[in-house]
């Protein structure tokens, strides 16, 4: 559960990355493919897996924009993320473990680019991504 302090940090962070979703998302997704090559199997239409690839940029942008969109819904993530959880859990059948792998890659990418690297920020990002991961995994069948 995110504390009020965590929410304040996350809101500030999401506002900062709002204009960088394509670059940060592509880097995080490329990092996922590099560190966990088995995840490439969920993207059969991709011809490349680097951060410069058009499809990687597009999907990374979608993911980071979805995170930014949670900014006004931090008190109701289960409801806000329900459709994404349903799509990934029931339609795409993404193994829930992959959400944790990807959230780790997102955290590393954010840490590499953000100037604010306090323990409080790291903790808030970790808790936020853990909550998003939990919600996205909630409808897996």
Swiss-Prot record:
Binding site for heme b: 88
InterPro entries membership: Globin (IPR000971), Globin-like_sf (IPR009050), Globin/Proto (IPR012292), Hemoglobin_a-typ (IPR002338), Hemoglobin_oxygen_transport (IPR050056)
Molecular-function annotations in GO: haptoglobin binding; heme binding; metal ion binding; organic acid binding; oxygen binding; oxygen carrier activity; peroxidase activity
Positions with a binding annotation for O2: 59
Matches recorded under SUPFAM superfamilies: Globin-like
Source organism superkingdom: Eukaryota
Keywords: Heme, Iron, Metal-binding, Oxygen transport, Transport
Sequence ranges assigned to domain Globin in this UniProt record: 1-141
Cellular component terms (Gene Ontology): blood microparticle; haptoglobin-hemoglobin complex; hemoglobin complex
Subunit structure, as described in the record: Heterotetramer of two alpha chains and two beta chains.
UniProt similarity note: Belongs to the globin family.
Function description: Involved in oxygen transport from the lung to the various peripheral tissues.
Name this protein carries in UniProt: Hemoglobin subunit alpha-2
Source organism of this protein record: Torpedo marmorata
Biological classification of the source: Eukaryota, Metazoa, Chordata, Craniata, Vertebrata
